[in-house]
Amino acid sequence: QRQMCIRDRSDVAIHTAKNHANKENIDINYILGEAENLLPEKNEHFDVVTCLEAIEHVPDPNQLVKTCSNLCKKNGDIFFSTINRNPKSFLFAIVGAEYILNLLPKGTHEYEKFIKPSELIQMMENNGLTIKELTGMSYNPLTKNYWLGKNVDVNYLIHAKKI
């Protein structure tokens, strides 16, 4: 039997997610804490590992990639999403989202921690992952619509397979 397990460092995020899951009657195992704390008992345990909008907030992104790779089974899928590091991403993700539109609390992001796709791809490949797809994610704050596309200037998603 397959089970969904979600681990997060934020008790607020887990509480919010639990409320959403309960409304949808979805059975999810929520765990508060660091992904690294799942090792070694969950080594190569998961079919799919996602690390969404988190890697730009940790002190050692490469260590997080390594942990995610270690948690994933052979031939499993891994997804990372994060923010590119360039002037456009600074303008959109920090100035726009945090200071003009107030979509996020001020200080949520540090520009220096943004990661270029080439940097994340290198970390992933160094940890036994084969890149399958790089996709851009865009958001229109006026229409509140999200979409996927080729533009990776600001937000992007990478899918990889564990060798």
PLM region spans:
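Short alpha-helix
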Residues: 111-134
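Conserved SAM/SAH-binding beta-strand->alpha-helix loop
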Residues: 10-12
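Acceptor-substrate binding/catalytic loop of class I
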Residues: 82, 101-119
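Short, small-residue-biased leader/transition segments that mark boundaries at the very start
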Residues: 1-6
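Conserved SAM-binding strand-loop segment of SAM-dependent methyltransferases
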Residues: 23-40
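A short glycine-rich, Lys/Arg-flanked "PGG" loop and its adjoining helix->strand segment in the class I
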Residues: 62-77
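A conserved beta-strand element that flanks and buttresses the S-adenosyl-L-methionine
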Residues: 50
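Conserved class I S-adenosyl-L-methionine
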Residues: 77-102
